[in-house]
Swiss-Prot record:
Its cofactor is Mg(2+). The active site is at 62 (proton acceptor). It comes from Korarchaeum cryptofilum (strain OPF8). Binds 1 Mg(2+) ion per subunit. Belongs to the HAM1 NTPase family. Pyrophosphatase that catalyzes the hydrolysis of nucleoside triphosphates to their monophosphate derivatives, with a high preference for the non-canonical purine nucleotides XTP (xanthosine triphosphate), dITP (deoxyinosine triphosphate) and ITP. Seems to function as a house-cleaning enzyme that removes non-canonical purine nucleotides from the nucleotide pool, thus preventing their incorporation into DNA/RNA and avoiding chromosomal lesions. The keyword Iron does not apply. Signal peptide: none annotated. It is an enzyme of class 3 (hydrolase). Mg(2+) binds at residues 33, 62. Substrate binds at residues 5-10, 63, 136-139, 158, 163-164. This is dITP/XTP pyrophosphatase. It catalyses: XTP + H2O = XMP + diphosphate + H(+); dITP + H2O = dIMP + diphosphate + H(+); ITP + H2O = IMP + diphosphate + H(+).
Length: 184
């Protein structure tokens, strides 16, 4: 099965979480990603477009950080916002803000012979007051509920807590039920 993305970090996370089930190949590709407010709609539209070029089963994933005090910003624009202002910029926007509630969402679209299946994971949490730990993207500033560590401080343990881990577990259940080797 193929994971199509321009983000190798995502591939590494999925490969780690699915390695006992499938041989996941990475197709590094930039693809049409329409701008919009609905992450699910974005990923389904992108998967339909990619299915014109990729003939074997593949999946893509899109995610976003939604901060309550910022009316859901950066949301589906998370990648762009991270590239432009990074973690420090988001923390600057949150300076003096007491409500630090946020959630991360991950939406996977699996494209195969019978169509497209969608799997969503969502994790509630808070925005840290400073950058903590490593990782990539917003990992060093997002603290999932049930932890006192940021994603960046969790290392590989992040998979148990993360939005991507949650959507991947749903994909995994589907592949186990359907049979990943029998996808048309």
């Amino acid at each position: 099965m193929i994971f199509a993305s321009s983000n190798r970090h995502k591939y590494e996370e999925f490969r780690r979480m699915l390695s006992d089930l499938i041989d996941l190949k990475f197709l590094e590709v930039d693809y049409l990603e329409p701008q919009g407010e609905d992450t699910r709609e974005i990923v389904v539209t992108s998967a339909k477009w990619l299915s014109n070029y990729i003939r074997e089963p593949f999946f893509i994933e899109d995610s976003g950080l939604f901060i309550e005090a910022l009316n859901g910003f950066p949301g589906p624009y998370s990648s762009y916002v991270f590239k432009k202002i990074g973690n420090e910029g988001v923390l600057k926007l949150m300076n003096g803000v007491e409500n630090r509630r946020a959630f991360f969402i991950s939406v996977i679209a699996l494209s195969y012979g019978r169509g497209i299946e969608v799997f969503e994971g969502r994790v509630q949490g808070t925005i840290a007051r400073e950058v903590r730990g490593g990782g990539w993207g917003f990992d060093p500033i997002f603290i999932p509920n049930g932890s006192n560590k940021t994603y960046g401080e969790l290392g590989d343990e992040k998979d148990r807590f993360s939005h991507r881990g949650a959507s991947c577990r749903k994909l995994r259940e589907f592949l186990m039920r359907f049979g990943s080797d029998r996808l048309p």
